[in-house]
Amino acid sequence: MTQNLGISVPIMSPSPMFANAPPEKKGVKNFAIDFLMGGVSAAVSKTAAAPIERVKLLIQNQDEMIKAGRLSEPYKGIGDCFGRTIKDEGFGSLWRGNTANVIRYFPTQALNFAFKDYFKRMFNFKKDKDGYWKWFGGNLASGGAAGASSLFFVYSLDYARTRLANDAKASKGGGERQFNGLVDVYRKTLKSDGIAGLYRGFNISCVGIIVYRGLYFGLYDSLKPVLLTGTLQVCFFASFALGWLITNGAGLASYPIDTVRRRMMMTSGEAVKYKSSLDAFQQILKKEGAKSLFKGAGANILRAIAGAGVLSGYDQLQILFFGKKYGSGGA
C-alpha cells in the first residue's frame, strides 16, 4: 500500500504518470480535504474492527505459525480463536498490531480516496456521452490505479502489522513473544533478511491490490448512482449496505491472493521460505488444499463492516460539510 510515489496532485512536481491528467481547480485544497476526511474515517473504522481483524489474521496464517512452533493446535473457528486469544494473552491483545495498522491505513486509505478521483479525471469518461460500460470500466481502472499507487511506501508497515498480529505467545518457548513491538519487527527482520524481508510478498500484493481496489472503488461509484436514487441518496444505512456487499465481494475475489502474500510475509526470519508467490500458491494447494486459501474468510466478512463504514461514512461527511452526494474521494 503505497502512497506518495512522487505524486503530484499538485503538491509536488508532476511525475510522468500524471502529466496528461486534466487540470483541476483548487487542487491543493481538494487534495487536503480528501486526505484528511478519508484518513480519519479509515483510522476510526480500523480501530473499531481491530479485534476481528486480528482473529482473521490468526486464522489465515495459523499453518505458518504451527510450522514455526508458535501455535500448538489449529483454531476451530472464529469463536475458538477469540476465546483462546483472550485466555492466553488478555483482552487487550485483540488490538495487537493496531498501531501499525492505523499508521499504515491512515495515509493508504486517504490517498486511495484522493487518487481515485484524480485517476477518474484522467480517464474522464461520461456515462451519457461515452456509454455505461466505458464509464464503468473507467471507474474500475481508476480504483485499481489508486490502490496500486498507494502500495509501495507503506508495505513494510503492513508487513509489521501482520507479524505483530500473528505474534501469539509461542507454544514452544515458555509463552514468549517473537517481537516486542513495531520497532522490534523492523530491527529483527532487517537483521535476518535485510530490506527484502520487509517486502516479501510485495509482487503478488500488487496484483491483489489492483483486483481488490478496482472492485472496491469502481463498483461502488458505478453502482451507487444507479441503486441509491431519490431518498436513498442520503440514507446512511442504504449506503452502508451497498458498501458492505461490495467490500465482501471484492474481499472474497482477492482473498486467495491475500492469503498467499501474508503466508509469504510470515516466512521472513524463518529458515524455510517460499521461492516465489507461485511456489507458495502451489505448495499451499498441494499440502493443505484449496480451502486453506480461504481460511479466515468468515472473519473477513465480519471485518468488511469496517470497510463499508469507511465508504458510507465518508459520503455522509461530504454531504454534511460540503453538500456532496457522490464520489467517495474528492471532486
Swiss-Prot record:
Going by the UniProt record, its keywords in alphabetical order are:
Antiport, Membrane, Mitochondrion, Mitochondrion inner membrane, Repeat, Transit peptide, Transmembrane, Transmembrane helix, Transport
Catalytic activity line of the entry: ADP(in) + ATP(out) = ADP(out) + ATP(in)
A Gene Ontology molecular function term of the record: ATP:ADP antiporter activity
Q: Which GO terms describe its biological process?
A: mitochondrial ADP transmembrane transport; mitochondrial ATP transmembrane transport
Describe where the Solcar repeats fall, as residue ranges on this chain. 29-122, 134-226, 238-320
Question: Which superkingdom?
Answer: Eukaryota
Give the membrane topology.
Answer: Multi-pass membrane protein
Give residue numbers for sequence motif Nucleotide carrier signature motif: 261-266
Q: Name one GO cellular component term.
A: mitochondrial inner membrane
User: What PROSITE patterns would the database entry show?
Assistant: SOLCAR
Where does the UniProt entry say this protein principally localizes? Answer: mitochondrion
Q: Where does ADP bind?
A: 104, 116, 261
Q: What is known of its domains?
A: The transmembrane helices are not perpendicular to the plane of the membrane, but cross the membrane at an angle. At least 2 of the odd-numbered transmembrane helices exhibit a sharp kink, due to the presence of a conserved proline residue.
Outline what the protein does. ADP:ATP antiporter that mediates import of ADP into the mitochondrial matrix for ATP synthesis, and export of ATP out to fuel the cell. Cycles between the cytoplasmic-open state (c-state) and the matrix-open state (m-state): operates by the alternating access mechanism with a single substrate-binding site intermittently exposed to either the cytosolic (c-state) or matrix (m-state) side of the inner mitochondrial membrane.
Quaternary organization? Monomer.
Q: Which family does it belong to?
A: Belongs to the mitochondrial carrier (TC 2.A.29) family.
Q: What is this protein called?
A: ADP,ATP carrier protein 1, mitochondrial
Organism of origin:
Triticum aestivum (Wheat)
